[in-house]
Amino acid sequence: MSGLSNKRAAGDGGSGPPEKKMNREEKTTTTLIEPIRLGGISSTEEMDSKVLQFKNKKLAERLEQRQACEDELRERIEKLEKRQATDDATLLIVNRYWAQLDETVEALLQCYENQRELSSGTEVPGCQEGLTRDVIPRPDPGTSDLREPLPVQFRAPLSEPALAFVVALGASSCEEVELQLQGRMEFSKAAVSRVVEASDRLQRQVEELCQRVYSRGDSEAPGEVARVRTRELGRENRRLQDLATQLQEKHHRISLEYSELQDKVTSTETKVLEMETTVEDLQWDIEKLRKREQKLNKHLAEALEQLNSGYYVSGSSTGFQGGQITLSMQKFEMLNAELEENQELANSRMAELEKLQAELQGAVRTNERLKVALRSLPEEVVRETGEYRMLQAQFSLLYNESLQVKTQLDEARGLLLASKNSHLRHIEHMESDELGLQKKLRTEVIQLEDTLAQVRKEYEMLRIEFEQNLAANEQAGPINREMRHLISSLQNHNHQLKGDAQRYKRKLREVQAEIGKLRAQASGSSHCIPTLSHPDDPGLNALAPGKEDSGPGPGGTPDCKKEMALLAGATSATSSIKKEELVSSEDDAQALTPVTQGLPSRGREPEARPKRELREREGPSLGPPPAASTLSRADREKAKVEEAKRKESELLKGLRAELKKAQESQKEMKLLLDMYKSAPKEQRDKVQLMAAERKAKAEVDELRSRIRELEERDRRESKKIADEDALRRIRQAEEQIEHLQRKLGATKQEEEALLSEMDVTGQAFEDMQEQNGRLLQQLREKDDANFKLMSERIKANQIHKLLREEKDELGEQVLGLKSQVDAQLLTVQKLEEKERALQGSLGGVEKELTLRSQALELNKRKAVEAAQLAEDLKVQLEHVQTRLREIQPCLAESRAAREKESFNLKRAQEDISRLRRKLEKQRKVEVYADADEILQEEIKEYKARLTCPCCNTRKKDAVLTKCFHVFCFECVRGRYEARQRKCPKCNAAFGAHDFHRVYIS
């Protein structure tokens, strides 16, 4: 029954795995759609940590899935083990039935061979000729020829039911049977087919014999007695054949029932042996109780004897200070009554035990009878048993489950195909998305590479131009330095010229002072000479004293020329200074612009001063005509005073006119300066040079005209002067004029040298100016180019930064796409693994389905055989059930008797313990008369319990955690150190960590 229940449980649980697989497939479909959200990422480390967290999460999920799969596999293994156990049991049953079938078939074949041998000697020759084609030569049943199928030419034609049975046996070919059972299957099929053929052949032989007998009887017309005899013999033969088949069927059924009952008998024998052991244990306990009862009886007898003899027990020397204890008659009678009751109880218990033993022996005898009866069970009883019905129900359940498994397998195949197609579509979609993303990424990377190459080219061009500009600046640096040195040398030269001009001014002042002295001397000597000067000519009046001092008129022209040359040199120097300052202002970032603006006014001041000095010198040099020598000195002095006043007024007028001219020239210079500032550099230089040239030419022409006029006046005046004193002065003046002319020649040479040098320097300055202009233009162009390059470089840097940021963003996108691709690859791998697992499980399910289909067909055949056997076993089963019904009350009675016996035993033990306690109390009462003594005795007992049982001196303070027995710590430690590591009471082994102290308060 347990095997059947296990089978049913396995069958019920067999429908579980497909549902779990369905659930697992649903889980896989849900995990496919689950998105991967990493959140905001600021660095690669954070992304790596989040990816690791996601991987750990996925690994945990995979571990959970694996654990769930392992649990499912464990459950499946347990179910398969249970199923294997049930299959083994069924296989054992099938093997047993099959072996019995082979034995019966061999027995039948042996009987048939024996009958053939017996009938071969007694047959009629005519019958032998007729039977030669029907009888097949048969080997021994034990030989290996039985295991080979018979050839077709030796087989006789069979009847329709026999042929159908043989065909059914042949249909159960080796396709459903394993290779190791194939030989046995062939042997069984051959043997059964031969048995069927033999039975059919015998039947046909009998029918042929009957027909021959009838035909011969009709033809030969024998006696009626022979016919009746043959008919009776045929009927008897048929009856005997039917009886033989029935007996064989009964023998087969009985053998099967015998094997089953033999198994049950073995189990009951084991149970009986167990019960016998329990009975022996109970008998041993009863003997123990008897011995204890005898001891108690002895003690009671001694107590009675002491009581009857009037013996008094005095206190012992153990420290109890009690008086004598005497037992009253009432207590003694009570004890006697209790003793008698206990004896009666023991006797009754003994009788009960004997009765139980007798019942046990009767149960054993009935069990043996039942064993014998179980060997012949009717078939109806077997059919009505619960096991047979359970087998039928289980067969129907298995058949229905096989149909359900087929439908579930078809559904699983459909789901697998659908999931496979959806998986393939999903993979194609993912591959197309991946290809599109890769194409986009490639195009973006190519664009970025192109832009990066362009930026690199522009950067290289800018770098080359920057290096060229640096080289050009390095080349222009020494030229600029040379120009600065030249400008500084020209400035130094201008300073030297200014110093010379100051020196000449100082000399001019000295000369004017000498002229003043000469005028004073001349005024003293020529006060009588009448003035013949023209009032309208201020220049002659101004030059008259000079003539008196310096002699003839032409003597004053070299000094004037020298001064004019000095003035021209000063003006050219100022113009060159202006040009140099303009160039230096352009080179030095307009650092000297105030100097260039202030120089024209400084240049005009020295121009105005020499003019005033010349006029001052010319004024006194214009003295009276030579005809004035005849005048008296008083008249001269008067005329001189008047003339001085007139000269002063004329000088004031001249100074005012010069002031006006200077103001006009100042205005012109201001206009020129404004024009110079507004005009470009080259035009300013040209205008300045042309203005200086015109001014110098005008001054030179003016000075030449003045010199001519002075020479003419000197000639006219030289004719008039006749004084010796005048002659002497004239000589001195001529000498001075010669000296001045020599100086003027020297100064002219110097002026020519300076003019040539100025021309050379002007030419060089113009060349340098042009070169500076070109260099400045180149510098401007280079500055513009540098500015352009710098702006382009800034733009390129910005573009480079933007491209780098875009590259970083694209790199992050690429990393994200790579992570997505990796995740998708992981999901694809997981799906492939799941697909492989599903394919493997599908293959396993298909194999299991094939096995189940084979098992189903086997079960069908077994069911057919079982149906055939069930009819045979029904009668035996009914018989066995009746016997079992008879045995069950006996078993119930025996069980009740055993329970009663155990109950009585327990009750006896309780009574004995109760009596023992009473006896101990009575003993204490007898020994100790006082209650204090009883308490002291109990205290002593408790103290004895608290003392160590090993040494009996120290108290218990250590416990063994293995068995929880208590001893003193010194004894336990001593035993541990002496390697006696076992408990003194129960011999349980203990270690170093298996004992510790206990503190009993």
Curated annotation (Swiss-Prot):
Low complexity: bias regions: 565-576
Sorted alphabetically, the keyword list is:
Acetylation, Chromatin regulator, Coiled coil, Isopeptide bond, Metal-binding, Nucleus, Phosphoprotein, Transferase, Ubl conjugation, Ubl conjugation pathway, Zinc, Zinc-finger
Q: Which GO terms describe its molecular function?
A: mRNA 3'-UTR binding; protein homodimerization activity; ubiquitin protein ligase binding; ubiquitin-protein transferase activity; zinc ion binding
Give the sites of the cross-link named Glycyl lysine isopeptide (Lys-Gly) (interchain with G-Cter in SUMO2).
578-579
Q: What class of enzyme is it?
A: transferase
State if Transferase is listed as a keyword.
yes
The catalysed reaction is: S-ubiquitinyl-[E2 ubiquitin-conjugating enzyme]-L-cysteine + [acceptor protein]-L-lysine = [E2 ubiquitin-conjugating enzyme]-L-cysteine + N(6)-ubiquitinyl-[acceptor protein]-L-lysine
Q: Which Gene Ontology biological process is one annotated for this entry?
A: protein ubiquitination
Principal subcellular localisation of the protein: nucleus
In residue numbers, the zinc fingers (RING-type) are 948-987
Coiled coil: which residue ranges? Answer: 55-91, 189-377, 437-525, 627-946
EC assignment: the record states 2.3.2.27
- Phosphoserine modification sites are 42, 584-585
Q: Where in the cell is it found?
A: Nucleus
GO cellular component term, pick one: HULC complex
The modified positions for N6-acetyllysine read 20, 355, 517
One Pfam family linked to the record: zf-C3HC4
Assigned protein family: Belongs to the BRE1 family.
Kindly state the subunit structure of this protein.
Component of the RNF20/40 complex (also known as BRE1 complex) probably composed of 2 copies of RNF20/BRE1A and 2 copies of RNF40/BRE1B. Interacts with UBE2E1/UBCH6. Interacts with RB1 and WAC.
In Swiss-Prot or TrEMBL terms, this protein is called E3 ubiquitin-protein ligase BRE1B
Its lineage opens with: Eukaryota, Metazoa, Chordata, Craniata, Vertebrata
State which gene encodes it.
Rnf40
